[in-house]
Structures are given as structure tokens and as C-alpha cells.
């Protein structure tokens, strides 16, 4: 896991509490210092929310996204695990993921 994640983990966990996150996992290049370009790489997260009232998902999703981008000062991708339908992509995710927060 890259240093920028470790240095901001407490902020990320507080944000997860604020935005009703059930699980947040790190995926992609930020898992490895070797693959992560500190100037160019975005940060990819796998996300699952707690049950929310209808109509709250968009505000919650985009609020969390903006918060994470503000913390890291870079582009963030949020991938909702329930939205992943491609089995090859899912297999790749399952091989390399790191739990950062669980409610």
C-alpha cells in the first residue's frame, strides 16, 4: 500500500463513517509503491454502502467521492462491488484488494 493511503487512513475512515460505508477496499496500482506513479496515478477503491433510503445513494456516493478526492488531491475511482458484472474483472479485483474500512 502506498504512503499517501497510510498517511490519510484515519481521515478516510472518518469519511466512511460519515457517508454510511459498509466496506471500503483499496484496489489497483495504489496497492504497490512499484506500480503507483505519485504524480499521475489515480486511486481506485471498491465500495459497498450500508442500506440507505431510496434517493440517498447518489448524494452519498458523490459526497464520498468528493471527500476522497479532497483528501488525496487527485482523481479517485469508486467501484461498487454489486455493479461489477464482468467475471474476469471481478477475478482480477479479488486477487488484489486491501480492506481499509469495515463498519
Where do the PLM segments sit?
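Catalytic core of pol beta-like nucleotidyltransferases
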Residues: 1-25, 29-38, 50-103
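Short, aliphatic-rich beta-strand segments
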Residues: 44-48
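The conserved glycine-aromatic submotif of the RRM
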Residues: 41
